[in-house]
Regions:
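C-terminal hydrophobic helical "lid"/dimerization subdomain
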Residues: 34, 260-305
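Short, well-ordered loop/turn sites that connect or cap secondary structure elements
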Residues: 82-83, 140, 226
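Rossmann-fold dehydrogenase core element
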Residues: 229-275
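Mid-domain Rossmann-like dinucleotide-binding core that forms the NAD(H)/NADP(H) cofactor-binding site
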Residues: 124-193
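N-terminal glycine-rich beta->alpha transition that marks the start or flank
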Residues: 12-15, 21-69
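NAD(P)H dinucleotide-binding glycine-rich loop of Rossmann-like/cofactor-binding domains
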Residues: 57, 74, 89-150
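A glycine-/small-residue-rich N-terminal strand-loop-strand element
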Residues: 69-93
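Glycine-rich cofactor phosphate-binding loops and adjacent beta1-alpha1 units
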Residues: 171, 183-249
């Protein structure tokens, strides 16, 4: 029987188990995918801990995972455009991709370009959708200056590149270990910590937009820098929407097969990098989350069944 990650109750990393499950069967309009790689995301840890129960409650036993890349193993009735053996990138809304096999809606899949490595493809969907939506939300145009917090993380590392492609000057807030990577991608790196507002002001004469992928006080920082609330997007501080009138457009706002295909095409063309911080086998899912939750990583942590 195939294996999948499950948890029976809310809790820490130790509630995650890899167990045998029945082989999933695709229904009408669905595709069975043999998973080759699946990214893990901070929001999945928060769901497992019960911190997002009011927004996204778990039903036990619960699976995990949204991102996936793999090989089509079968299709349900009515599916066109995909057949057994096709290499695909996709996403599932059913928290089920941290597994050897997953059933996915056909409309949630895009063809994986041949030159894109499995671990990169499997890391792309949630971070890519979120970054895409955030850049779109702040309406960047050539000549704008945007600051991105968490600029070397899974979402931030993609957002800074998409912002550069939009013609913006990009200031990236990150730990000093990641400043070289940011500078190499045309981003002005700025260190966290006391005095960050002054360092940002010295880096650029104005800030027109702000993308917060980190949380904490960064929405307030954006407003302190004079950014209009309509051009601030946070993917973390959801309460700031009501409090300050900022935006909170992320994964759901960007999720589509067409966006996935566009981003995968940029990767294949060498115009977008998805940094991979670490790769773990499915059986080491607990270790994968420990690496994620230590923080200060560049890019994504990925499981390979």
């Amino acid at each position: 029987m195939p294996q999948a990650v499950r948890f029976e109750e809310y809790g820490g990393i130790d509630v995650l188990q890899v167990v045998e499950v029945p082989q999933p069967v695709p229904g009408p309009g669905q595709v069975l995918v043999r998973v080759k790689a699946a990214g893990i995301n901070p929001g999945e840890a928060k769901i497992r801990e019960g911190l997002l129960h009011a927004r996204w409650p778990a039903v036990f036993p619960s699976g995990e995972g949204t991102d996936l890349a793999g090989i089509v193993a079968g299709t349900g009735s009515g599916v066109t455009g995909f057949s057994a053996g096709d290499e695909v990138i996709g996403y599932t809304d059913n928290r089920a991709s941290h597994a050897e096999y997953v059933v996915v809606e056909a409309g949630h899949l895009a063809t994986k370009p041949a030159g894109v490595p499995w671990e990169v493809a499997g890391a792309l969907p949630v971070a890519g959708f979120t970054a895409y939506a955030a850049v779109r939300a702040v309406a960047l145009a050539p000549g704008d200056t945007v600051t991105v917090s968490g600029a070397a993380g899974g979402v931030g590392s993609i957002a800074v590149q998409l912002a550069r492609r939009a013609g913006a000057t990009v200031i990236g807030l990150a730990g000093e270990a990641n400043h070289g990577w940011l500078a190499g991608h045309g981003v002005i790196p700025v260190a966290y910590g006391d005095g960050v507002a002054g360092r940002i002001r010295r880096a650029a004469d104005r800030v027109d937009a702000f993308i917060d992928t980190f949380g904490g006080d960064y929405v307030q920082l954006a407003l302190e820098l004079g950014v209009k609330p309509a051009r601030v997007d946070t993917i973390v501080s959801f309460d700031a929407v009501q409090r300050y009138g900022v935006k909170a457009e992320g994964n759901a706002a960007g999720a589509s097969a067409s966006v996935l295909a566009e981003l995968a095409g940029l990767i294949a063309a060498g115009q977008l990098e998805v940094p991979i911080a670490a790769v773990f086998p499915l059986a080491k899912v607990q270790d994968a989350y420990r690496r994620l939750e230590r923080g200060h990583i560049r890019g994504k942590v990925v499981l390979v069944p």
